[in-house]
């Protein structure tokens, strides 16, 4: 039995891959499926274009480049993981500027390396940019945006009867090997795979020996409730730096429209208090979409940690991370889009021999909700 600790996207995708191969497995989640970093994300399955905004196709951009196609394959119901029930917010994302773009960057965007990832489009083709006061550049990225609650629901259906709610309090060991988990619902024995994001650190701290070190890269996301709706926007505003100045996704809850803001705004907001981030968010939004004149009723800040394997300078890891020490597998996807790549790496480390196993009689893990609403 493969015991997957953590019911975020990495654990869910991995479990679906195991189930498709008839490898007995279960997912143990302490709160609700997707409740951590998964539902806190903006649902954008990007292929690394935003990592190439300095005019260089970096390792990170190359590694993640195949992921949109992999996800689209699953969203069509093809391959081992059938996500055809997942709803899309959009089939693509937008990249825009409200100021001039450096000539070298324009040339890079038009290069052969980037043509398969993006195309420049007429603003008239997009409702949010079809306005005489928009004078910038507009690109379409062939990278889907998912309605994340439907993604979690699809996995809950695929894995019905295999996802359990319990808090793993420690790892059970015997002869220096991990042989199972101690949970709030009882003990369970099997091969353990940790995909618990930020929760991995505590579980590893109880083990003897050397294990991967975790880092946290926090974000201060801004949630803007509008007084009246604007055309939906899903994409990234170009700035002068190597990261998107602002990343915008649009959501509707209880008849109200919300803009969920990330990008450089959320990076900078980590060291700022909420009032400062709110003021900066309002200003950034009015600059990024000035022609739409978005009217903000209220703003609140949602802070979230990105849990990842430690890097030398605390920077973003380029790829999904999987490590096997003795018989324990530790995994961080590092990005929502990289969940399939993480599953591929884990599968290479497993003994895929199918063995019968009895599942625990524990409560079913509920589906999570957007934590920032």
Feature roles, as predicted:
Residues 289-373:
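C-terminal catalytic lobe of FAD-dependent flavoproteins
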Residues 191-325:
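Active-site substrate-recognition segment that forms the wall
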Residues 19-41:
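Glycine-rich FAD pyrophosphate-binding loop
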Residues 164-180:
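A conserved short coil-to-beta-strand element within the FAD-binding core of flavoproteins
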Residues 1-27:
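N-terminal Rossmann-like FAD-binding beta1-loop-alpha1 element of flavoenzymes
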Residues 43-128:
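Dinucleotide-binding Rossmann-like beta1-alpha1 core, especially the glycine-rich loop
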Residues 183-191:
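Core beta-strand elements of the Rossmann-like FAD/NAD(P) dinucleotide-binding domain
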Residues 122-159, 264, 325-333:
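Helix-loop-beta segment of a Rossmann-like dinucleotide-binding subdomain
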């Amino acid at each position: 039995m493969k015991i997957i600790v953590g019911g975020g996207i990495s654990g869910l995708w991995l479990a679906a891959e195991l189930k498709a191969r008839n490898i007995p497995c279960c997912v143990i989640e302490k709160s609700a499926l997707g409740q951590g970093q998964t539902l806190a994300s903006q649902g954008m399955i990007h292929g690394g274009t935003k990592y190439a905004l300095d005019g260089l196709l970096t390792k990170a951009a190359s590694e993640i480049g195949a992921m949109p196609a992999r996800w689209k394959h699953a969203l069509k119901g093809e391959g081992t993981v059938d996500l055809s029930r997942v709803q899309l917010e959009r089939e693509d994302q937008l990249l825009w500027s409200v100021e001039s773009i450096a000539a070298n960057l324009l040339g890079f965007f038009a290069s052969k390396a980037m043509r398969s990832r993006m195309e420049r489009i007429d603003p008239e083709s997009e409702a949010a940019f079809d306005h005489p006061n928009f004078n910038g550049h507009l690109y379409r990225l062939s990278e889907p945006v998912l309605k994340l609650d439907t993604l979690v629901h699809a996995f809950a259906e695929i894995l019905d009867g295999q996802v359990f709610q319990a808090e793993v309090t420690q790892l059970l060991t015997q002869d220096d090997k991990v042989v199972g988990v101690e949970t709030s619902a009882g003990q369970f024995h099997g091969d353990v795979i940790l995909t618990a994001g930020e929760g991995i650190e505590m579980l590893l701290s109880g083990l003897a020996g050397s294990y991967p070190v975790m880092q946290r890269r926090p974000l201060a996301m801004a949630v803007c409730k509008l007084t009246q709706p604007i055309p939906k926007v899903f994409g990234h505003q170009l700035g002068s730096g190597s990261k998107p100045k602002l990343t915008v996704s649009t959501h509707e809850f209880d008849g109200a429209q919300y803009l969920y803001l990330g990008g450089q705004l959320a990076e900078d907001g980590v060291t700022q208090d909420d009032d400062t981030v709110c003021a900066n968010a309002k200003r950034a939004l009015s600059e990024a979409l000035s022609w739409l004149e978005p009217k903000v009723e209220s703003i609140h800040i949602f802070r979230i940690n990105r849990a990842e394997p430690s890097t030398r300078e605390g920077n973003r890891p380029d790829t999904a991370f999987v490590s096997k020490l003795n018989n324990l597998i530790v995994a961080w996807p590092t990005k929502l889009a990289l969940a399939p790549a993480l599953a591929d790496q884990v599968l290479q480390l497993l003994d895929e021999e199918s063995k019968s196993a009895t599942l625990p009689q524990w409560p079913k893990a509920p589906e999570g909700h957007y934590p920032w609403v």
